[in-house]
Amino acid sequence: APTGLNLEAWRFLVLTDPARKLGMAELYRKSFEQMAELRADYARQTGTQPPALRKVHRDLADRLHEMPALILVCMQGRPDNTLARQVGFYGSILPAAWSLMVALRTRGLGSTWTSLHLIHERETAQLLGVPDDVTQTVLLPVGYMRDAVLAPAPRKAAREVTYWNEWGAARPD
């Protein structure tokens, strides 16, 4: 995956220990409940979260500890509040997380991208021994894709989310 200055400061913490996964799941569920009202407001405002998707989110919160593995994607260091540093920092780690998801898929493993655990980042760090100078970014629950029917996810048409030459402008004919 691309990384700023080719530093490869990413780190991947793979959780397979049942007790650690259970602790992580408890923090995740706590975050899930705290975010319930915000999620509902966002869904109402944007119309982007159908009921079936809400069920998927609840199922993940309820069953996170049952996943064969949880991968906590981290980056060494902590970005300060300057935009330039944050752009380079997250621009270095997020492609690595996505590349890992693609690699998992080629091996018959499914994963999903979530950052909900970050509401309780300190507690997560204490549970897993993550040093203070390491930034947690994404949690990837990983599971086997038995009998999975892979199909494109429902998405808006590209013309609805893509603009040409200025915000809101349709593609020139």
Task: Label every PLM stretch briefly.
Residues T3-L5:
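Glycine-rich phosphate/pyrophosphate-binding beta-alpha loops
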Residues I71-V73, G77-Q126:
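Small-aliphatic-rich amphipathic alpha-helix that forms the alpha element of a beta-alpha
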Residues E8, V14-I93:
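Glycine/small-residue-rich phosphate/adenosyl-binding loop
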Residues T137-D173:
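C-terminal helix-cap and adjacent tail motif
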Residues T124-T137:
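Short, electropositive alpha-helical surface patch
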Residues P68-L70, S111, T135-T137:
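Structural motif
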Residues A1, R54-D59, T124-L127, D147-V149:
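Glycine-rich, charged/polar anion/phosphate-binding loops
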